[in-house]
Amino acid sequence: MAKWQRSFFQPVLPLGEDGRRVTGSKEHIALSRMAAGEGMVLLKNEKNALPIRRGTKVALFGKGTVDYVKGGGGSGDVTVEYIRNLYEGMKIKEDEGKVEVFDKLAKYYEKDIQKQYADGAVPGMTVEPELPDELLNEAREYTDTAVITICRFSGEGWDRKCEAAQDGYVLDGEEKRNSELSAKIFENGDFCLTNAENAMVEKVKKAFPHVIVVMNVGGIVDTKWFRDCDEIQSVLMAWQGGMEGGLATADILCGDVNPSGKLSDTYAKDLEDYPSTANFHESAFYVDYTEDIYVGYRYFETIPGAAKRVNYPFGFGLSYTDFDWKVTGASEENGVITVLTEVTNTGKKAGKEVIQLYYGAPQGKLGKPAKVLGAFKKTSILQPGERQILTLKLPVNQMASYDDLGKVCKSAYVLEAGEYAIYIGTNVRDAAKIDFTYVVKEDTVTEQLSRKAAPYHLQKRMLADGSYEELPQREYVEEEGLPRQDKYAIGLPCPDTRGQKGIDFLDFLDSKGVRFSDVADGKMTLDEFMDILTLDDCINLLGGQPNTGCANTFGMGNLPEYGVPNVMTADGPAGLRILPKCGVNTTAWPCATLLASTWDEELVEKVGKAGAEEVKENNISIWLTPACNIHRSPLCGRNFEYYSEDPYLAGKTGAAMVRGIQSQHIGASVKHFAANNKETNRKDSDSRVSERALREIYLKQFEIIVKEAHPYTIMSSYNLINGIHASENKELLTGILRDEWGFDGLVTTDWWTFGEHYRETKAGNDIKMAAGYPERIKEAYEKGFITEAETRLSARRILNMILKID
């Protein structure tokens, strides 16, 4: 096939064997089911209540039995042929002779939920119906085993327990609708059980001797109601498992799959135990990241007294079998610490285990978390008695800390003198210090940098002892430029009114003169091609282009007279998102939090590859995923779309996803760069964060992905970072991303940002989506606020990215 043929508005050309489509194929759906099972986490299993014994009769309680949430809303939504809920999954197991299901109860929930759907409700945003005593008694007569399912939904553009701020911000539009609906359904906030859910749970606990709980959620929720409850024997964190999530859950409940997932977050006793909760809703216009680097387990394992506030630690997850492990060797050579760990299945069932390596740096002058994840490995399936040796590697320089105030060496990563402990285990709390210590004899600078994206108005930050230190204040002076436009008017022009009509493939083949394909074929260099383009040509490249085919998130490129294709973009993190009106059903993959909970880079890479095949088959070139922001707070409405509270786990998972995607010569777009940890007023909220926390927590996962997977594109975020829109932040986009990390790809804005287009271009943000503002760039050029060289540089990066596309 000729290069870019799919971008020239051609009919879909199937990628499968014998002319079959891979989009939504049985093979991809099977992979989605398998991935879902790999990431579900068994939190509790008293008296081996799970797996359910063959032939057991079960009663399925809670609307979540049929009201299955496959994933979150917004860019993470996917159009699918079907969604398998838990009732349907358990009925399949019944057909296989493994369980018997009390249908009358499930049908009661099904009838109620279908009525709520007909009235406009969406999965997860429904009311728990009252459980009639008569039906409860019938269920108890049928069986002594109950399965309760609790489900939750959240989405792009609104936060959980979204409250009107105290500084004048008024919720409107979708934010207002979703927050009002959430408040109506979840009177205690959706972190906790509703009154109706709690009443149902209490009834079931009293009536049934065997109670199992399934949590169909996208992120952190309250766990204290089942953590120490003797009446509840087992709890499965099933997450939002994609289109086959209900069947994947049934696979685990019935023992066809042995759970091997591990938590990618810390589950505290109460919402208020997370340091971010205190100020998450303090203002709609800023968030002070005063907890600094002490996010998630870094807080709970370090700050005095915080450890006792944890219900389930980071990295925790049970299995149906037992494992023993022992360190068989530890050494350092050429700046890399290597630890060999032998894992043995000592139980009676086949299963997998995850070995986690943490390091503990000396407190020194900077202060450090007690433990930091440094490496991890998952075993293959081990049969009873089988063993496997895992090799975990930790580069010494990975243990360095960033000194933003000059306590050791200003604006540098440093290894402070002292002993660096190594811990091995299966979660952060149980990880034990091994008989190996790495010693740094004197303070050592591993990388000298310069101050970038530092705060102006963050007044204080947390230290390792739980106290706070004052931070220096400074004033921001904006670079001279055009008077700013009304930010609420920005984004109104539509690409369909600005973009040029594209060129179809046959016309492209017949075109004469210089063609962009000459660059791809090696007949001329990209620089030679750039010399032919006028300034107007370059400016036209810097904005989004019209949709074609089944795409709905617009394109990039599109200079028909030069044969530059209009390459399409598409959401999103849970699968290829195509509008229902197009009639294309794709595969809905498990949510990102579940994928991170697999702790399996190879599996995530397979998911990325399969998803990219669907993107490519539908003539789309850039997949707007993965989303890699940190789980700073459980209240962020988009956490389901992100991987973890830990930047190393998020970075390794994201890098695996990018490798899988780009193996198909489809561009991944890693987002949202950076510190986009709140959805309320997301286009105008300022993340005030220290440079150290920014570099060690909120940028580190992006750095790992850039250096290990080389993504074609990065998407800058809506929010401001220390007073400057991320899309206009030159220190971030050029100084850190390109100059320090060596990123050579394309930077795109998120869709319809509040940033000024010409300022974004100057900062290193190459294209404004979904629409550009060429007149504004021309005005800035004429008045000397942007140069032709800056414009051409971004245009060149756009064309260079298109050259990478198949």
Feature-to-residue mapping (PLM):
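Glycoside hydrolase catalytic-domain context in secreted enzymes
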Residues: 1-430, 451-806
